[in-house]
Amino acid sequence: MPDSSHLITVPVGKLGIIPLESCKALGEKVDSYLARWRAERHNEHKDNITFAGYERDSYILKSSCPRFGSGEAKGTLQDSVRGTDVYIMVDVVNHSIEYKICGKTNMMSPDDHYSDMKRVIAAMAGKANRITVIMPFMYESRQHKRSSRESLDCAIALQELVGLGVDNIITFDAHDPRVQNAIPYSGFENIMPTYQFIKTLLRTTPDLTLDSDHMMVISPDEGAMNRAIYFANHLGVDVGMFYKRRDYTTIVNGKNPIVAHEFLGDSVEGKDVIIIDDMIASGESMLDVARQLKARKARRVYCLATFGLFTAGLDIFDQAKAEGT
């Protein structure tokens, strides 16, 4: 009878990465790093049958989402996921991918990327050991709360993923991390890029002086205030904020238009100011805040955002840079 002390039980399966088309380049970089790191790292269990597949040339599991001429699609797996800890990587705001529908070219929207992810999960048919979704930009994160007769799309998406068998969701700088309340019994990890912001800022602008007399962190609206406070606490500087005055009698493109940005805080005259937010969409609000800070005699203005969507293009930013805004 074998000695039970030689039996090893591990609570994890072998690693598998499925980068969808929207996140293919990043997935390949992660795969290359993991393969190199595991090959160089010492592990006493490498030759143990329990850890079979620990060291491989690649951890990517091949998948695809081919489309019919009608625009409908299906998820397919070319590799087995049985007993595997699968990490699915998806970038729902990658607008560079196109497909044909009824002979016409159509750009993939966040809804298309999200649907493809669900198709791949469905193709696993419950055979994976665990499923983790890595979604840098949280799908529908801006629709995190209800105003009157509106759908709660982000909460619905999270509950839908959990219902499909997803064990953990990893995202970066969620628009409102409290949306995880929709799935209180499942994993939701929100990773903040504060360290990367500070490191890049100091490397690119070495003459910054980090004190309250020379620097100030600005929140462009009420929603970004928590980020601004957290960032300012790390730098040891003061915080200011703008709030948006809206015209609630009018709706333009699905939202109440902004009438003006009003400032709350100490004087910014002669100071370097940092505007921080989770995303730049069209960029109009960010640039309006920057112009107002310049009008208040701020020395230099830096805009930091986790996600640069630039839905209206980059021309307005190039123009603002040229004008010294």
Which residues does each PLM region occupy?
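PRPP-associated nucleotide enzymes
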Residues: 1-325
